[in-house]
Each structure stands twice: as C-alpha cells, then as structure tokens.
C-alpha cells in the first residue's frame, strides 16, 4: 500500500513508497522481509527521496538508553531509534559530557555511525566503542569494534561492505570521565568560561544562527562534504584565493570549506524552482515547495559545475539521495 514519504524526510519532496514498516523492537527484524528494493531510514534528516520509491522503507524506531559507570569512563548503550540531540542533552543533564560539539545534529543514533557524524572539530568515531547490527542475510545479531567500523570523514563500513546488508541496532559510546574540551572552531574560542554546558549552548546558538530549522523550512542540513585536498593543491589555491578557509587534515592534506566555495562562486540565494541555496548558509539547500527531484539534481550539478570551474574542486554531496529503487550519486560533468 502506497505511503507518503514527504513527512519522513526533512527535505520534504513529494514522494511515496510502495510499503512502509516501522521497527519498534528487534524481534521484528527476524521476520521482516528485506526483499530488494528496500531503504533503511532513521529520521530522514540526511536522506532525500528524489522520486516515488518502488520498494519498502524500513524506519528504525527502537528506544532505550543504558548507562554503565566504569573506572575511567561511562559506557552509554543506545538503541538505534533514539534521537541524537536528545541523547546529548540528557547525558549532559546527568553530568556526562563529551558530545556537546555534536549537539543539535538532527537524526537518530543508529544513523550517526553510518556517516560518522561530526561538527566543530569532533567526530563520532572518537567515542564509539562498538556497534551492534542485524545481519540481514544470516538473520543474526553481530558486533563491530571501533576499528572494524572503518570510520573515515563522513564514512564507515556501513556505506561500503555492509551497505544494505546490516541494520544498526545499538551504538555503544565510551565517554571519558576526564572532560577534554575541543575549542578549535570559531565562536568556541571566544568562550569566557569553558564548561560543557557553555560549549553545548554555544554550539546550539551557532547552529541555529547558520542552519534553518528543517521542520519550518525543509532542508537536509549540510548538503556537501568539505573537500579534502593535498597540501600542494591548497598552496596553489592560496596564491589566488588567499582567504580560503582551510583546516589541517592529517600530514599531507587539508580540508577546505565547501560553504565558502559555494558562496564565493556567487550562489547564495540562487534558485531553481522552489529549491534555493540558503541565503545565510551556502552549504545548505532549502526547499520552498513545488519542487521535484529533477530540480534538486539540476541544482546539485549547477553548484558542482560552478565550483569546479572556479577552483578545480568537484564537490561531493553528503546527503544520501534515493531514486526510484536505490541510492544514487550525482556528479556534474566538468567542462573541458
């Protein structure tokens, strides 16, 4: 039976799926049919359905948080359907800090390891002890340790070897008792009093000032990854674009700000149908309605082409795009 997907993903394109299933307990996974095509979903804050989906959308809605105190840290075991920001907030209220840089990131806990969420100098991988998942083929529950998750920048094994083969059920986080603030980004450096609560509140204030609320103005958050380029490439760019924001990423690479690249290409406020490059934050695309998946694809390609022609950098979308039966990747053909 057809089910609307418009309220199930925050970009809110008009679309529907053939069947919709909500998983409230893990026993359901053992009897659930995973006949392709199927799409696993949390809160849909990093997913856009471009067209009607011909398969089954399976939403993880399991709940539960367990806290175990150990000698030097707290082990936090969280069900996949829990809201991420609510977890951060509730842990801080219990005087268990560590995740405050990741406050207000939308979505569920189960979706967080898939793309190794990160913000303001901190990535989730720093705190993951292990991830439990349901093996779709074998119908068994298994566990991966941190190294086995193969975390990278907005990346993990769940995007590759275990893509469409695993359903994350529980995430185990280890939060050290000795709090070590990460203040490397912008406004956090200006804090008068450095406390977990102060960092938490500043991160929320900063995100609210830059990012529109997806439930009042549909969007999928940061749409493009910040490109990682070689030190040599950065040096060449800085000779022409001296104010290009960049951050060291390992010994041989730097990360550059995708939002700055888009803004400097003159694309703030650029619009195709009801889809617009947000006027306050160029890294965000917003949907004013009356838009189709084809409009979003055209916008992505226009941004990629504009940035590539100016900086010789091809932007990669961070948001997961779903067409009628599978995930897809959009890349503009660079002009020779």
From Swiss-Prot:
UniProt keyword annotation of Cell wall biogenesis/degradation present: yes
Gene Ontology BP term (one): cell division
InterPro entries given in the database record: FAD-bd_PCMH (IPR016166), FAD-bd_PCMH-like_sf (IPR036318), FAD-bd_PCMH_sub1 (IPR016167), FAD-bd_PCMH_sub2 (IPR016169), MurB (IPR003170), MurB_C (IPR011601), MurB_C_sf (IPR036635), Oxid_FAD_bind_N (IPR006094)
Enzyme class: oxidoreductase
Highest taxon, organism lineage: Bacteria
Main location: cytoplasm
Pfam families per the UniProt record, alphabetical: FAD_binding_4 (PF01565), MurB_C (PF02873)
Catalytic site positions: 154, 222, 318
Cellular localization per UniProt: Cytoplasm
GO cellular component: cytosol
This protein's UniProt keywords: Cell cycle, Cell division, Cell shape, Cell wall biogenesis/degradation, Cytoplasm, FAD, Flavoprotein, NADP, Oxidoreductase, Peptidoglycan synthesis
Cofactor(s), names only, from the UniProt record: FAD
UniProt-listed Enzyme Commission number(s): 1.3.1.98
UniProt keyword Oxidoreductase, yes or no: yes
Recorded catalytic activity of this chain's protein: UDP-N-acetyl-alpha-D-muramate + NADP(+) = UDP-N-acetyl-3-O-(1-carboxyvinyl)-alpha-D-glucosamine + NADPH + H(+)
NCBIfam families named in the record: murB (TIGR00179), PRK00046.1 (NF000755)
Family indicated by similarity: Belongs to the MurB family.
The protein's role, per its UniProt record: Cell wall formation.
Protein name: UDP-N-acetylenolpyruvoylglucosamine reductase
